[in-house]
Amino acid sequence: DRICTGITSSNSPHVVKTATQGEVNVTGVIPLTTTPTKSHFANLKGTKTRGKLCPKCLNCTDLDVALGRPKCTGTIPSAKASILHEVKPVTSGCFPIMHDRTKXRQLPNLLRGYEHIRLSTHNVINAEKAPGGPYKIGTSGSCPNVTNGNGFFATMAWAVPKNDNNKTATNSLTVEVPYICTEGEDQITVWGFHSDNETQMVKLYGDSKPQKFTSSANGVTTHYVSQIGGFPNQAEDGGLPQSGRIVVDYMVQKSGKTGTITYQRGILLPQKVWCASGRSKVIKGSLPLIGEADCLHEKYGGLNKSKPYYTGEHAKAIGNCPIWVKTPLKLANGTKYRPPAKLLKER
């Protein structure tokens, strides 16, 4: 007689690594990992996702919106998640800006990090009557407004001495910038200065020497000295060629805190300010946003979570995302495999 044990005689294709026994053959496994493929970015399920700062502002970059370029002012939707689609925001098509002098390119990304963003309905200071005035408010043919007349950014007033009596060199002047947001938000105050060649500086301001500027708010102080001349004529968005340049900066004022700006000639005084609150999770990505996804991943775009873990490229992700692991994970759902038993001969 022959006696055989009741064990399957087929080989097991499943191998799992264990903490105590190394590689072990088992009769069944459940894969816990997936390797995503690149896809388009999407709206994050269960929350509002912001692409462009102002989706209804046509033909406007996010920097246009952040600076208040005429024809580029509109409502910025609230959002818990935001797509950083302009890693290095392009120039604003209104007036030539010296981007390398300041952190102006960071302004759209700063705003993107807030859940709620709105532009104040009135100006933070009366620019015409600011120290060193009276001033007339300068405009540019390169910056047409909604009626196609000359305009300028809504966030700044180009303060040009109004008459020959005050069109002279001046010592440093200081203006206080009050906090005007009404709901305890952070106040983002945009300001800057204009400089040109010596001839234009004398014509506009009565002084051709480099001018000094300082801003201070929330414990942060920034100093500038203007550059005179040396600029090639430059046009933005088909506007008129400009021999001058503007430098743009901003300061963040906390609730109830006053800021200060010390300046000489060529100042771009703050006007409308941004009032921003809450936090929006920001991730680098691309537009347009198509459909919905559980997770937004910088390398793979929109992902729907089919497994708890993933392999592949490790990068920042937001939402209900799988966890990155270096190697695939498996969950054993069968017994430890035993090789087929040998026939036993009767003694």
From Swiss-Prot:
Keyword Manganese belongs to the record: no
Residues bearing glycans: 25, 59, 145, 166, 304, 333
Any one GO cellular component localisation term in the record: viral envelope
Membrane topology, from the record: Single-pass type I membrane protein
Domain of life, per lineage: Viruses
Transmembrane segments: none
Pfam families, sorted: Hemagglutinin
Chief location bin: virion
MF terms in GO: host cell surface receptor binding
Purpose of the protein: Binds to sialic acid-containing receptors on the cell surface, bringing about the attachment of the virus particle to the cell. Plays a major role in the determination of host range restriction and virulence. Class I viral fusion protein. Responsible for penetration of the virus into the cell cytoplasm by mediating the fusion of the membrane of the endocytosed virus particle with the endosomal membrane. Low pH in endosomes induce an irreversible conformational change in HA2, releasing the fusion hydrophobic peptide. Several trimers are required to form a competent fusion pore.
Subunit structure: Homotrimer of disulfide-linked HA1-HA2.
Protein name: Hemagglutinin
Lineage: Viruses, Riboviria, Orthornavirae, Negarnaviricota, Polyploviricotina
GN (gene name): HA
